[in-house]
């Protein structure tokens, strides 16, 4: 039996070699044909290809010039004008932070005048928080959701504040979505437990006590040293009594 098996294996092996060589022989002319066709295409369309290549290079150069000579100076100007509005914001003078005063622009004008700059992008965050504190929740949401930042702390704050605005509007489904995003985005021991606790409260408002229990228990297990964990057992006991 062993010898028969070996003979069959050897026969199959020889057959495979023959097939592989046959396939290689078949591929060669096809590959040569394809190469020839490519070369002919390049020769016949050399002018068009050169034009396309030149156009791409021109577009790259225009973009670099646009960034350097247009966006760059506007970025500096917008950043310089942000300082006074930020000072109003820090002092909780929300109206002046939004609209500015006689001498300096507020965040709204900075967005309007320098909308494609990093400074204007950050202004969306400041403006959203200002409207949130003024109780203008829809405007807060509009501005906070326009913020596109790479900084995790600011981005998490923007998401969490958006959730706060939805809570005030009693749109608990969207509040839940944004608190989840905020907790995940923050991914730290300071903000994440805070947003998890708020998420638990939103679940409770919707009578989803199981999900609330999960959120509170996550604080207990993952963030035991956070301020939110201090009395979290009371929250857990409360929702578990309703399960």
Protein language model regions, located:
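Short solvent-exposed coil/turn linkers within tandem alpha-helical repeat scaffolds
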Residues: 72, 111-120, 134, 148-156, ...
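N-terminal positive-inside, membrane-proximal cytosolic segments immediately preceding the first
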Residues: 13-55
């Amino acid at each position: 039996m062993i010898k028969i098996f070996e003979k069959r294996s050897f026969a199959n092996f020889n057959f495979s070699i023959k097939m592989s060589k046959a396939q290689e022989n078949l591929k060669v002319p096809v590959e040569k044909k394809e190469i020839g066709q490519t070369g002919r295409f390049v020769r016949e369309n050399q002018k068009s290809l050169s034009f396309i290549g030149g156009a791409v290079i021109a577009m790259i150069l225009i973009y670099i010039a646009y960034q350097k000579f247009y966006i760059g100076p506007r970025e500096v100007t917008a950043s310089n004008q942000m300082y006074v509005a930020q000072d109003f914001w820090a002092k909780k003078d929300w109206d002046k932070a939004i609209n500015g005063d006689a001498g300096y622009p507020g965040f709204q004008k900075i967005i309007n005048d320098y909308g494609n700059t990093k400074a204007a992008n950050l202004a969306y965050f400041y403006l959203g928080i200002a409207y949130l504190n003024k109780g203008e929740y829809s405007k807060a949401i509009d501005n906070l959701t326009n913020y596109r930042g790479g900084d995790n702390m600011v981005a998490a704050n923007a998401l969490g504040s958006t959730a706060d605005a939805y809570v005030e509007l009693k749109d608990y489904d969207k509040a839940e979505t944004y608190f989840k995003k905020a907790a995940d985005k923050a991914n730290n021991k300071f903000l994440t437990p805070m947003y998890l606790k708020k998420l638990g409260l939103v679940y409770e408002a919707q009578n989803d006590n199981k999900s609330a229990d999960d959120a509170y228990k996550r604080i207990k297990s993952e963030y035991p040293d956070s301020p939110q964990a201090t009395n979290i057992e009371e929250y857990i006991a409360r929702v578990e009594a309703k399960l």
